[in-house]
Amino acid sequence: GRNLLVTILQSRQSVADISAWSDAVSHIVETFLPLTQEFQIGNAINRSKWGCHNTTDYLRLLETLPDLKARYPGIVLAGSSVIDFEPLATLRTLFNGHQFDLDACCALLYVNRRGSPFSKQYGLFDLRRKLRLIATLASLSKRCASRLWITETNWPLLDTKPYTPNSGHPRSTVDEKTQAAYLSDYYRIAWQSGCVERVYWWQL
């Protein structure tokens, strides 16, 4: 068997009705507890189409976690849930005055728009440096344990429009051989960094 990580998605309604969000999260946890104790709270929280218009919206959702952990001892909660490399959003989710406690920092760390994992963003950050920065933030945070999970990454395939997230733009889509090479590089870099506990190739 394999450990399952269940991602609990938010919507704009979650932010508008915190009580309903809390009830929904509890229901999801209760439903899946026979199968797993691991849950990711929120998804792509720095993209408004997923319901959070800013990090404050997400932090309000996280403030429901203490009650959840009290009711279900032993559950493992991962959060931050920032997609792509946006360190200011990650910083805000990990350093704040809100009251919650995460067992792992999760990041949906796509680098496909750069091409290879060795390519740099902002002239400085290749994948290795991105991982080290996020891991360092998690290690210094009082809201999160020093564990880094990459809970989504991928290189969308050429000629799969309209099913690819970026509608098949050739700048950030690749053929299967290149995808396999880039994913191998990604996993190798993550392993060699010594700061990543797990990497998930996309989500179901």
Please describe what each predicted stretch is.
Residues 1, 97-99, 142, 173, ...:
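Glycine-centered secondary-structure boundary/capping sites
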Residues 36-38, 147, 151-155, 168-204:
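Substrate-binding cleft of secreted/luminal carbohydrate-active enzymes
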Residues 2, 30-33, 70, 139, ...:
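Sec-exported extracytoplasmic/periplasmic mature domains
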Residues 113-164, 196-204:
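Glycoside hydrolase catalytic-domain groove-lining segments
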Residues 12-133, 160-186:
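Active-site cleft segment of glycoside hydrolase catalytic domains centered on the general acid/base Glu
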Residues 8-10, 88-95, 146-148, 203:
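A structural signal for the main folded, soluble domain(s) of proteins
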Residues 60-63, 70-74, 139, 155, ...:
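Polar/charged alpha-helical tracts
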Residues 2-8, 37-41, 77-80, 103-107, ...:
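Hydrophobic faces of well-ordered beta-strands that scaffold small-molecule active sites
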